[in-house]
Amino acid sequence: MVMSSYMVNSKYVDPKFPPCEEYLQGGYLGEQGADYYGGGAQGADFQPPGLYPRPDFGEQPFGGSGPGPGSALPARGHGQEPGGPGGHYAAPGEPCPAPPAPPPAPLPGARACSQSDPKQPPPGTALKQPAVVYPWMKKVHVNSVNPNYTGGEPKRSRTAYTRQQVLELEKEFHFNRYLTRRRRIEIAHTLCLSERQIKIWFQNRRMKWKKDHKLPNTKGRSSSSSSSSSCSSSVAPSQHLQPMAKDHHTDLTTL
């Protein structure tokens, strides 16, 4: 019973694997597939072609114009075709590709023109644009305001006197508030200072001394004395005229 059921079931073919005839009738296989699955078209000594057939350079001479009438093209395998994006593979019958042509040489006239043009910058260097200078970046000089100004001494910094220099100057001021030219030169050489520095120090020291002793300024005192003398001179003639008028009146009465 078990054997008969096995024989009955063995007659049925699994629908998942239809026979080759159905594939051939439905057009699922191409000519190559029909040859593979048919098995009767080739002989027993037939060998399937490889993926990358090895060309035989001995049969075809180098530099031929094309394949001969008796030569057959190699069969293509399932790999990448020659000349595809992966690289160029020359077929046995195809000639080797020629090397690329060199670039044309420049004409001598054009080369001479390019060398004679100094304004044209070299190709590797970039053009340098001039820097933008704004008005607030420009420094105002005195020469631009007054063209006749030839320039003078710059603004002097404040002199820092040492303690020894101040002590010697105070001693000299205690004895002489005004210096002569000769004495000023001697003190300048002794204290390693300039005559101008000695002169300015004595001027400032005299102003301080007058302020401490509450003395009037010399310039203000001279102006006040001149004004008082002018007032006294204007009053004096009027005082002389009054006695003269009285004497003249007495003379008239006596007559």
Swiss-Prot record:
One of its GO terms (molecular function) is DNA-binding transcription factor activity, RNA polymerase II-specific. Forms a DNA-binding heterodimer with transcription factor PBX1. GO terms for cellular component: cell junction; nucleoplasm. It comes from Pan troglodytes (Chimpanzee). Residues 94-107 have a biased composition (Pro residues). Signal peptide: none annotated. Sequence-specific transcription factor which is part of a developmental regulatory system that provides cells with specific positional identities on the anterior-posterior axis. The lineage of its organism: Eukaryota, Metazoa, Chordata, Craniata, Vertebrata. This is Homeobox protein Hox-D4. The keyword Amino-acid biosynthesis does not apply.
